[in-house]
């Protein structure tokens, strides 16, 4: 299923040229920095999905090799940065082409029957590995819960609960008791919760069996997922879901790790920063007169583990974002980065220290709309086995030299000269610190 509206997925079939047999599909999913909606960057403080941007149902972009130009023009007409969007969509199409070519090259070498058979065997192989890994987890019922700071519209302490049950080679993850979906955009669709569960299960199983669990249908075949309909882990339309993908997914991961920690206390690390620290800025670039839409996530502290300190200034868990170099940022946008570095001392103390967060200060060189979508501003990431919690994050507006503390989720009209300071959480410590 989908994640949130800025994530656009292209899927194409691959047919064997000689037999016209459907071999499989190639797919590309990419986050687009603007897909319309009420604010630049398409990460608004929305209270329904209609405010978040363009909703694209499953439609044909290409038919018999020809592009649907009406659809193409419609998509580009609804976004603030059409040239950038066209380039990103073309890149996704190129990825599909490359995947199709590589798969057909494999078929040409080994034959369609062998390739299709290998696909089925890979799924079965993953199923066997998963079952073997689950069998190494002690049978029992393990419960955990955690909270989101707020939804940006006044609802606080939004709970996520899970009950993990292990029986032989099967496990179930029951989210009964989780808070109902809320007005603000921290609701997650079922696909997000399933993705977080898949990620955590792989993280747990792989070290237990000392094997890499292949991604695919077999990697969740022995896992039962129970999601209460209409909750923040299985939200229903017209719920706002912008932050479900980037923030709630992190908390789901934290809760799942908390449940597994009860079963495997010497394996699971302390909590990492638990947020992607999303920042978007949009407006008109005075250098060109063109619209711009900037979106970035900021790394933070990794939780410490039983054998090592946590890393500082990195993304963890449900994020694969990389650091954006200052030079590239200042070249592309009307910004000046006035400070960027490690937030020393923000990691939790312990036998192994949690990683430190980051501080990133961006000065606006023109007026623009600013949106922050963050978490772990109320409570820092928890330590484990006696380790201390990491420091909570902070969002600060520096205007004419005066600092103003901003909430975890906020939209504001930025003025030329404003500095937006994002200070990300540190990771939790692991084990009691020695005197």
Predicted regions and their residues:
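Glycine/proline-enriched, intrinsically flexible loops and inter-domain linkers
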Residues: 1-435
